[in-house]
From Swiss-Prot:
Cu(2+) 4 binds at residues 88, 90-91. Cu(2+) 3 binds at residues 80-82. It comes from the Eukaryota. GO terms for cellular component: Golgi apparatus; plasma membrane; side of membrane. Residues 235-257 form a propeptide. Residues 54-95 are annotated as: 5 X 8 AA tandem repeats of P-H-G-G-G-W-G-Q. The gene is PRNP. It is a lipid-anchor; GPI-anchor. Its main location: membrane. InterPro entries: Prion, Prion/Doppel_b-ribbon_dom_sf, Prion/Doppel_prot_b-ribbon_dom, Prion_copper_b_octapeptide, Prion_N. This is Major prion protein. Sequence repeats lie at residues 54-62, 63-70, 71-78, 79-86, 87-95.
Amino acid sequence: MVKSHIGGWILLLFVATWSDVGLCKKRPKPGGWNTGGGSRYPGQGSPGGNRYPPQGGGGWGQPHGGGWGQPHGGGWGQPHGGGWGQPHGGGGWGQGGGSHGQWGKPNKPKTNMKHVAGAAAAGAVVGGLGGYMLGSAMSRPLIHFGNDYEDRYYRENMYRYPDQVYYRPVDQYSNQNNFVRDCVNITVKQHTVTTTTKGENFTETDMKIMERVVEQMCVTQYQKESEAYYQRGASAILFSPPPVILLISLLILLIVG
């Protein structure tokens, strides 16, 4: 009788734990940053020592005059010049103000900003960047560059450097170095293009410092994504059919015995 109760409680605990792990897999993992050594990537022969020379035009996947996923010059889901359900120009239904003021035109749905922010925090795929994801915002790392001038320059200009990195899933790379190299290249290039479009330019010192900063952030992103990837793999192995069937069989034998 005692064995029966013990077996029942063990089975109940196992089922509850299994369900909780399944739910936890859907929760986003927290981010962070760490500090480390210098850049491991030599220059690529760009003029002036910069690997990423300023380029004209807009950034990859970036709309004209707005942020990521933002319409041209306007807010999310906001009509031009009027509120929802109102025709353009302030006229009444069926009156002037263009074809949008006629009956039969459905209202445009509003975008839920909480969903947009949640997707970005979890590493949303960026359109136009070929499968790259945008990581969560990080605090810029505290780095010493070996001389007072660059240390002071970084402290005074750190706001000019990115606080998010672009990356692909870790399972597409054979090691950390390849992940970090690709992450640094696309992040620095995208940030340089976007900033140059706004009329700002980067000096050789800016490029050197930015590469070091982005490198540390990419290392942090790799560690975060690797931990999440291995946790998903471990959960898949633990709760794969053979171990589950074996455990349930042992519990049944314990209860029957």
